[in-house]
Amino acid sequence: MLLLKHLHILPMAGPGPMNGDILLENGKIRALGRELSAPGAQVLELEGLYAMPGMVDAHCHIGMWEDGNMIEGDDGNETSGPITPELRAIDAINPFDRCFAEACAAGVTACVTGPGSANVIGGQFAALKTRPGSVEDKLIQAPLAMKAALGENPKRVYAAQKSSPQTRMATAALLRRALLEAQAYAKKRAEKEGADFDMAKEALLPVLRGELPLKIHAHRADDILTAIRIAEEFHLRFSLEHCTEGYLIPEAIRQAQDAGAKVIIGPLLMDRSKVELRNLTFQAPKLLHDQGIEFALMTDHPVVPLQYLPVCAALAVREGLDEDTALKAITLHGARAVGLEDRLGSLEPGKDGDVAIFRGHPLDVRSRCVMTLIDGQIVHDQR
């Protein structure tokens, strides 16, 4: 048992901020309260420091594009074909990439990482803790989601190869075809004579059954609407990834969210490096929040280094978003966006003992994370 004493606690659930203690036991949060006692527990006096849930990045590519490497550590896009649902992030992640340690030291304790957006269907994402160790040591869930992409990226990659897709029409058609072929495959597999095993089609069956959400990369408003259209056609669970121009079509986003879609915004701390980013703005979080839309913030690491997730939230506050919503966008709403809110994202009894402790408010860019705990264990300590 570990008892953290006399903290300013930002629990992201319940009645709100409080001054008090956090008791951790067997990797979980056991209790929050004032002047807690626990015979036999290790006690840490942390008066004046801030405690918040370990942060959650709902979309990144950590370990897939390794820091400081080029092709040697570039394992995020398999560009031999545009439909590759059978690919698994866990087979490409380098768990010893130093960026995991840097994220952990910044208070980011969980991340969702996977293939990039070169392919119409790119493969399977995984959720990891940022603790030291192998993929198996870090693993929360795999697969967590299936990656799909609309817009410029698949067009650019395959036009250069003089193959399909070269237009948005072809991108949407390839996505539909893959889903339709997987449906037909499932039907034939269920029949008496069966069907020959197909690894790619097999990988799409959990998506069609609603067991695995589709993470759909879409920046431009029309691509976002295409993502919604196709997901609704096939009755899929899905999330809108990046959603850069989502603030231009709030009614469509809200209707999709009311039907179960998740929204993950970002990366915002970047240049407008392509045409579909021309309406990129840090005002987007506030504009969506004002329309009643819940969202998470992402770094899209390595686009924005994972350790700067709280900086992204702070800059959204500078542009008018309230602090509570900004913090939730990198904690509870991040966990909710990827279906892990039962374990992550808030300081509540029964949830994983993932805690980030700061000297100063976490959204003050001058503040430093002085301690990080994952599953109740201290994995970073700079007090």
Spans of model-derived segments:
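C-terminal cap of metal-dependent C-N hydrolases
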Residues: 6-11, 336, 348-383
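Divalent metal-coordination and catalytic microenvironments
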Residues: 7, 22, 27, 48, ...
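Active-site gating loops and adjacent loop-to-helix segments of metal-dependent hydrolytic enzymes
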Residues: 66-93, 131-134, 145-157, 208, ...
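His/Asp/Glu-enriched, well-ordered alpha-helical/loop segment
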Residues: 67-68, 72-80, 84-85, 213, ...
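Histidine-rich, glycine-flanked metal-binding segment
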Residues: 9-54
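Metal-coordinating catalytic core of metallo-dependent amide/deamination hydrolases
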Residues: 126-229, 233, 302
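Metal-associated gating/positioning segment near the N- to mid-region
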Residues: 49-115
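Active-site core of metal-dependent hydrolases
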Residues: 89, 186-281, 296, 336-338, ...
